[in-house]
Amino acid sequence: MADASAPDKKNAPTNALKPDLIKIAVERVLAAIDTENNEDLILAAAREPREVVAARAPDLFTSAAYSWSEEDELGTRMRASSFFPVASMFAKIICCLFLLWAKSCTGHGAMVTGLTACTGAYAIASLLCSFVVYYNVRTDNMPFGTYTKLFQIAACIGCGCYALGLTMEKLFGDSEMYFALFPDAKNSPLVGATAKGSALILPQGCSVAPYVPLAVSVAYCAAVVYDIADTIFPLLWVRTTLNEFAVF
């Protein structure tokens, strides 16, 4: 007769697997509970109102970091952005040279004196701004600060208003536009008139001299308008798009 206390060989493997199955089931239940809790936390966080802190535009323009890429090591963008201001200054100098030639022919030197002084003042202001831009970029800051930008705007508007006023006065007030529009006016006593009222005969090769003040005035005023627009319009664009004033 077999011993009743001996273990049943058929039931032994089944009894051994029961603790493992229970452990696996408990782990799955706990994992499901954790997953459900995480989902509840995510949904609760999504329902909670969040405080949105708006970034101010001036904070975005405080550093020049990452403004250069690997493909831009030679400063191609800097050359492209400085081409038109340099061209504007070059056009002003050429205009002054043409007026100097016209002065030698007609004797009218008020416009060349005033525009040369205006060009010199603008060149000095541009040179000072260039030094400030160079220093700020080397120190990883934006090119212009608030006071430097205000100085640049004041210089552009001041020189521009003076140049526009001078050209309008000399063309319309002193009849120089009349000289340019009517070729026969060069033989009138108004052109190069002396104190006695006699007419001066224009030297040979100066037949186009009466046209120079009008053409130069148009070109110079166009350059002045560009300078003002190039200084002010970017600030207005940032104000319109970002609703903030930013200096850069």
UniProtKB/Swiss-Prot annotation:
This is Protein UL20. GO terms for biological process: viral life cycle. The chain crosses the membrane at residues 82-102, 114-134, 153-173, 218-238. Plays an essential role in egress of virus particles from the nucleus, cytoplasmic envelopment and virus-induced cell fusion. Forms a functional protein complex with gK and this interaction is absolutely essential for their coordinate intracellular transport, gK glycosylation, expression on host cell surface, and function. Together, they modulate gB-mediated virus-induced cell fusion and virion egress and therefore actively participate in these processes. The keyword Membrane applies. It comes from Psittacid herpesvirus 1 (isolate Amazon parrot/-/97-0001/1997). It is found in: Virion; Host cell membrane; Host endosome membrane; Host Golgi apparatus membrane. One of its GO terms (cellular component) is host cell nuclear membrane. InterPro entries: Herpes_UL20. Interacts with gK (via N-terminus); this interaction plays a role in the coordinate transport of UL20 and gK to the trans-Golgi network (TGN), and is required for their cell surface expression. Interacts with gB. Keywords: Host cell membrane, Host endosome, Host Golgi apparatus, Host membrane, Host nucleus, Membrane, Transmembrane, Transmembrane helix, Virion. Its main location: virion. Belongs to the alphaherpesvirinae UL20 family. It is a multi-pass membrane protein. It holds the Pfam family Herpes_UL20.
